[in-house]
Amino acid sequence: MAVPRANTSKARTRRRRGVNMRLQAPNLVECSGCGNLIMPHHVCPKCGFYKGKQVINPDKLD
């Protein structure tokens, strides 16, 4: 039966595991009202549009 010659170092183990734990950039879409980049399924904070309809008044947010 095969046996490793030496213990795997912490750095080597973490480097191998770290490849699968990379952070992904957030998925952004253009707002239909103003063209601002927003996260999908969220109201645009700049113009207050969601799915082509204005749902909030951004002037009242300030």
UniProtKB/Swiss-Prot annotation:
Listed InterPro entries: Ribosomal_bL32 (IPR002677), Ribosomal_bL32_bact (IPR044957), Ribosomal_zn-bd (IPR011332)
GO molecular function: structural constituent of ribosome
Record-level GO BP terms: translation
UniProt keywords, alphabetically: Ribonucleoprotein, Ribosomal protein
Classification via Pfam families: Ribosomal_L32p
Entry GO CC: large ribosomal subunit
Stated family: Belongs to the bacterial ribosomal protein bL32 family.
Name used for this protein in its record: Large ribosomal subunit protein bL32
